[in-house]
Amino acid sequence: MKRFWRWSEPDCRARDETAPDARTLYLEGVIAEDSWFEDDVTPAAFKADLVSGSGPITVWINSPGGCCVAAAQIYNMLMEYPGDVTVKIDGIAASAASVVAMAGTRVLMSPVSTMMIHNPLTVAIGDSEEMRKAVQMLDEYKESIINA
């Protein structure tokens, strides 16, 4: 399965034996809540990879965003991770990826990187009652994003 992330494990030969192992996580591409195609991934699969190691991690993000619910789950997983999490924006952390970026103990951006934050959006179909529900849902998502 193609994933929108990949891990780079530390090179044991080059590692200082007194320093803790550091893993690197690359978040690249669209963040998805459910797997609709082979190139999508669920937060559950992400969690399995996250907890398979320990120690500090560096998260490199280059993502246009994706599903805000999946991003919130990944944000929570990184916030609960027991080691230090350093986030580095490599290119772009847009939309839902900006939420994931806020989970870092430290967040670093180069002068040529971009973070794009916007109000949540959706497509809604239905009568006026359904439209009110959609507006309420968007307002709730906006508040949760602001809290990150």
Enumerate the language-model features and the residues they cover.
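Terminal-region recognition feature
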Residues: 1-148
